[in-house]
């Protein structure tokens, strides 16, 4: 199956000959008003694939992130659990049940890691330390910064995130799309999880969207 893109728009998907004949068709990704949560994983009632919006607590999930969720659920139908999506700047935790995104929680951890010059490989002791005492995060970060312990910086940030997102991973099945140190962090806490390639999930999401649109 071939995917023809025009910027952020999927022009078509299918055999090359079909794409050449039908390039006028398009499905904007994230271009429409977002769907309020809870919402089906895939919804193209508006002709494209919008993102998600949550009122309380306020959150926004872009259309391309939603596409990755759709790709994961396409390969794991009837999956019930939490997806942790690690991007360049943000981490999203999404509760999935009955082919719906029920709720979400997002964090600036990865952006803070970049600003504070943290390592890609978190220190596991730092994760546990701040997970246990998240109120000491600022102090822990200053100590790690003074010691130039870049792994500890990342560990403390992820530990604080895990403390805040405890309801999303404690006692739940977790799928990690991307990494950013989250696989090691969850493994250290004994959380059952599986790891998945986000780009592969995105490609599968495009295929699922194309099928839903009848391409």
Label every model-predicted segment.
Residues 1-83, 94-215:
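Nucleotide/phosphate-binding catalytic cleft detector across ATP-hydrolyzing
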């Amino acid at each position: 199956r071939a995917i023809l893109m025009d910027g952020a728009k999927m022009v078509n998907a299918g055999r090359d000959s079909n794409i050449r004949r039908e390039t006028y068709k398009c499905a904007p990704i994230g271009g429409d008003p977002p769907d309020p949560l809870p919402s089906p994983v895939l919804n193209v009632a508006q002709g494209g694939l919008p993102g998600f919006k949550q009122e309380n607590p306020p959150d926004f999930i872009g259309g391309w992130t939603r596409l990755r969720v759709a790709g994961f659920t396409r390969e794991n139908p009837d999956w019930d659990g939490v997806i942790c999506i690690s991007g360049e700047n943000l981490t999203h935790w999404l509760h999935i049940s009955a082919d719906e995104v029920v709720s979400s929680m997002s964090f600036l951890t990865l952006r803070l890691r970049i600003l504070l010059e943290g390592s890609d490989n978190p220190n596991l002791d730092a994760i546990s330390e701040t997970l246990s005492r998240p109120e000491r995060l600022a102090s822990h970060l200053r100590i790690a910064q003074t010691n130039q312990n870049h792994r500890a910086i990342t560990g403390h940030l992820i530990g604080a995130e895990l403390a805040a997102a405890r309801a999303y991973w404690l006692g739940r099945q977790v799928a990690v799309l991307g990494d950013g140190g989250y696989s090691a962090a969850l493994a250290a806490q004994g959380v059952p999880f599986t790891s998945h390639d986000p780009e592969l999930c995105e490609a599968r999401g495009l295929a699922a969207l194309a099928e839903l649109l009848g391409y």
